[in-house]
């Protein structure tokens, strides 16, 4: 098996496994929890059911359909970028990490495209993203979270973790791939 074939296999595996885990957890939470319901798993970790219209960690901007269409276009560009990385024989770690960004983006897109219609509260492209992971790491005496309030999902975790790993360990690879694209466009 060539290096390119191995990278394609890794990308496919990561995207499929991450999507299956993300969607399975979201569907479980959506069908077994009431909106706003929370269960403590560990003193610093809760599963709770919230939905958001926005981006990662509930950030909101633009209309729902515009945001969903933007996400779909961004995943298309990201898929093309991963294809170029593989074709240009980028390091496997960089390709794999970038695949986690794509997997996370696809996970949230599925919510937006299908969940509104599937659960009967909105049309196509207008679904809400299901979030459930909550880590109230530091709380006050009243139990109110003082540090790290976001509730997020596995897709958000894939994106955020991958971006941090890219910035910490693959910055040169990222810079080189972007410079290479610019140089190719000039030629």
How would you describe each model-predicted region?
Residues 1-187:
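Alpha-helical transmembrane bundles and membrane-interface segments of multipass inner-membrane proteins
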